[in-house]
Amino acid sequence: LQETFGYDNLDRLVSVKSGTEETMKISYAPNGNILFKTGVGNFSYNEDVRPHAVTEVENADGKIPGSTLYTSFNDFGKIQLIEDAGKNLRMNSTYGPDQERWSSKLSRNSMDIRTTVYAGEYEKITERGVTREFYYLDGNAIAIREDGTTNIYLAFTDNLGSILSVMNEKGKKVFDASYDAWGQQTVTLNDIDLHRGYTGHEMLTEFDIINMNGRLYDPVLGRFFSPDNYVQMPDNSQNFNRYSYCLNNPLKYTD
């Protein structure tokens, strides 16, 4: 599969072609707001109140779930609750004094589905009654410990650090995934219950969003849920859009 990507004079992604077929088109306002995106349709914003936050999308192709996500944040702007009432799903997150994630708990109808404990590149995940410890090591190695046994796997990533496949010590593929230009993931194999993916971040597939530690990202919209408090590139006008993802150039930058 050969893809070709087009950009405007502000280095923003405006088109994706698969062969000769255009599979995605994106248009922008001068301030970096997405106005149209294939698969979503037209975007609306409130120019008077939070002018960079999406208020409504057309959902032209019906790819956006009809249920509503409720979110709440702590005093430091970190996500502490995600709730999808339509699916009866709820995720609570806790943080340490340095505002690094300590844990998250996913539940449905008050019944626990998955509990995760975080400590840097270590995760302890309890899911379906099974506890696994994940160690993300240098050189794209992943050590997974379960029932006292540790197995070593090798992850293969793209230039952005997105995990494309994982193989075990015998060379057997145990994970396989692909991503569109904005990070929407398609998983075709996952024998190790891996929850990381796009740019190495945690995929919250139950909510169709990505937890990028600091903020939540929607790969369908190509926008963040909350604003960025920092302007890293003050000489770039697009960096003042506090909800845009990577200056609207998702194939070049990571968050």
Predicted feature descriptions by range:
Residues 1, 254-255:
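Short, intrinsically disordered, charge-balanced linker/junction segments flanking boundaries
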Residues 1-152, 170-174, 188-194:
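Acidic/glycine-rich beta-solenoid
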Residues 43-45, 147-213, 220, 242, ...:
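A motif-centric feature for acidic-aromatic and gly/ser/thr-rich catalytic loops and repeats
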Residues 78, 100-101, 213-215, 223:
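Short, cationic motifs built from Arg/Lys/His that form the positively charged side of catalytic pockets
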Residues 86, 122, 202-203, 216:
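Short, flexible loop/turn elements at secondary-structure junctions
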Residues 204, 231-232:
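Short histidine/acidic/glycine/proline-rich micro-motifs that form metal-
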Residues 233-238:
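Short linker/helix segments within small regulatory modules
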